[in-house]
């Protein structure tokens, strides 16, 4: 057992790269505030090695004052994570409407970017979302699932897409968050060579397998095969 990095106030982001060589971390720093919650305090997002050396700074965000309203968010880079299908690639979202869709109308609320170790190239656009970015479920360079959400309409939309491609995403599901009967659930995942979960594709039939609890007295589990 040994210490990695320096003593600090660490945020909620702390994860090991799929190839187990790097750490993605967030540290909280001053000035603190009584006017915003702790997760909106200034935070620095960076990649360090397993000896604690800083490798790359992704963002150094100031205090965040998120306005009231549906689908508002941070105007700064957010939702950092590792691509589960690559050895050491970080992705994140950036609001194109400065975090306030009512004050700043845009065709796309968010753009998702990525950058790969050794972080000596420009960030690369992964995808765009018309609504607020929620998540990406990875498979490989040719296929992933992109999920966007709207608190205003209470809807989640799931698309199939090719990461970092000019091809338009294809809508797969458009479901109300209040409609449990038609909720397709979550895709079945399997572990890849890095030990990370990726979306399972039944290549024999070009299908995804979806798992859902269901909302019927006759059963609590539903498996759905979806052609992609």
What are these regions (language model features)?
Residues 1-228:
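Beta-propeller folds
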